[in-house]
Amino acid sequence: MVPYEYYVALSGLLMVLGFIGVIVRKNIIAMLISTELMLNAVNVAFVAFDMKLHDVVGQVFVFFILTIAAAEAAIGLGLIMAIYRMKKDVDVEKLTELKG
């Protein structure tokens, strides 16, 4: 069995990669994918600590986070589609107007 420290390290690596993706990318869709990667990093950490503590609370939190992530992705993609229809672009640096 793989020690839980490896899962925690993997979770940290995924979190850092997701954070770098949010900071570096200029495309809104890539930023949304990076945010989802960070949420999945939290899920891996919860499951790793759940393995160590022999409790099911971590797995319950994972189900809640997956539900929230699905709702966030649906709302985010809907907003991105609306922005694309208005501006014909999804580049963050070109979306500086607050006018409706």
From Swiss-Prot:
One Gene Ontology CC term in the entry: NADH dehydrogenase complex
Major location category of this protein: membrane
Which keywords does this Swiss-Prot/TrEMBL entry list? Answer: Cell inner membrane, Cell membrane, Membrane, NAD, Quinone, Translocase, Transmembrane, Transmembrane helix, Transport, Ubiquinone
Transmembrane helix keyword on record: yes
Q: Which GO terms describe its molecular function?
A: NADH:ubiquinone reductase (non-electrogenic) activity; quinone binding
Q: Where found, per UniProt?
A: Cell inner membrane
Q: Which domain of life is it from?
A: Bacteria
The UniProt entry, under Gene3D superfamilies, shows: 1.10.287.3510
**What is this entry's stated membrane topology?**
Multi-pass membrane protein
Cited Pfam families:
Oxidored_q2
Q: Where are the transmembrane segments?
A: 4-24, 28-48, 60-80
| Gene Ontology biological-process entries | ATP synthesis coupled electron transport
Its EC number is: 7.1.1.-
What is catalyzed by this enzyme? a quinone + NADH + 5 H(+)(in) = a quinol + NAD(+) + 4 H(+)(out)
NCBIfam families, alphabetized: PRK05715.1-2, PRK05715.1-3, PRK05715.1-5
Q: What does this protein do?
A: NDH-1 shuttles electrons from NADH, via FMN and iron-sulfur (Fe-S) centers, to quinones in the respiratory chain. The immediate electron acceptor for the enzyme in this species is believed to be ubiquinone. Couples the redox reaction to proton translocation (for every two electrons transferred, four hydrogen ions are translocated across the cytoplasmic membrane), and thus conserves the redox energy in a proton gradient.
Family of this protein: Belongs to the complex I subunit 4L family.
Please give the subunit comment from the record. NDH-1 is composed of 14 different subunits. Subunits NuoA, H, J, K, L, M, N constitute the membrane sector of the complex.
| Name of the protein | NADH-quinone oxidoreductase subunit K
Q: Which organism is it from?
A: Sulfurihydrogenibium azorense (strain DSM 15241 / OCM 825 / Az-Fu1)
Q: According to the entry, what is the taxonomic lineage of the organism?
A: Bacteria, Pseudomonadati, Aquificota, Aquificia, Aquificales
